[in-house]
């Protein structure tokens, strides 16, 4: 994002914080309604452009949003939306992406208030791995030719009775926006949930499954390095031969046999 959109995003997030009261029901409603608003904006380009048109005063854009969505969403959601559309965004897509992020944060807030954030984070990670490991499922969920409603219905059917309501809502939103980065989108959501708990996420690829003791030791070691609690998400990858690869943000620690062989190859070249 450029500076204008970063400032607009910050002010919109402040509006979200002010709108949420600590009640998981208010947060859940706000998150779901923001997703519904985004669905409308995705479908109606003219409205999307009008609400982000910087040549029109912010107050007029706010009035337009109230005419379109007033009475159809809660007071909290309307307050967030009014603030967001009144800002000057560098790009229309920045406004829509921020509304998506605010919806995600509101739903994660509701999970935190209900004491279910840990479960949601774990489910999002595991769902991302399941999709990444199933080419047919990934294709079905990322197929731009398939209607968004059909993809939302598919993921809801797969998760029914197996996942937290917040996880299902977040998953439906991800697959409904025609992204081709399904696995990465779920990783980002899992990271967002961890950040909500003031933790960082270590994405670990290991040649074999780690025991609970090994995971705990790894998390403790990484916490000493990064100075914050670390959530360890492990994906088994036999192609590494032995050892593991740890990714935290842009940092990569490669302790795998394949990595060591590659470094040796470069040294000998």
Curated annotation (Swiss-Prot):
It is a peripheral membrane protein. PROSITE patterns: ATPASE_DELTA. It comes from the Bacteria. GO terms for cellular component: plasma membrane; proton-transporting ATP synthase complex. Its main location: membrane. It holds the Pfam family OSCP. This is ATP synthase subunit delta. It comes from Nocardia farcinica (strain IFM 10152). The gene is atpH.
């Amino acid at each position: 994002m450029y500076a204008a959109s970063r400032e607009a995003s910050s002010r919109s997030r402040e509006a979200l914080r002010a709108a949420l009261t600590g009640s998981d029901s208010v947060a859940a409603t706000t998150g779901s309604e923001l997703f519904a608003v985004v669905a409308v904006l995705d479908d109606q380009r003219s409205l999307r452009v009008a609400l982000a048109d910087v040549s029109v005063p912010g107050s007029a854009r706010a009035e337009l949003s109230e005419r379109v969505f007033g009475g159809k969403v809660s007071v909290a959601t309307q307050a967030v939306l009014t603030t967001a559309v009144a800002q000057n965004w560098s790009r229309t897509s920045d406004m829509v992406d921020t509304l998506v992020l605010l919806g995600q944060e509101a739903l994660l807030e509701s999970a935190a208030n209900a004491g279910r954030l840990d479960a949601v984070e774990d489910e999002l990670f595991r769902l991302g791995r399941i999709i990444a490991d199933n080419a047919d499922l990934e294709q079905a969920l990322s197929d731009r030719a398939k209607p968004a409603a059909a993809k939302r219905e598919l993921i809801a059917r797969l998760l029914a009775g197996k996942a937290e309501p917040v996880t299902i809502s977040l998953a439906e939103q991800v697959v409904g926006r025609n992204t081709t980065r399904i696995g990465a989108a779920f990783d980002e959501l899992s990271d967002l949930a961890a950040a909500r708990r003031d933790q960082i996420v270590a994405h670990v690829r290991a040649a074999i499954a780690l025991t609970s003791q090994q995971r705990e030791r790894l998390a403790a070691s990484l916490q000493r390095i990064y100075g914050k609690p670390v959530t360890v998400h492990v994906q088994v990858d036999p192609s590494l031969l032995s050892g593991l690869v740890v990714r935290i943000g842009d940092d990569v620690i490669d302790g795998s046999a394949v990595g060591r062989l590659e470094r040796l190859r470069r040294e000998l070249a």
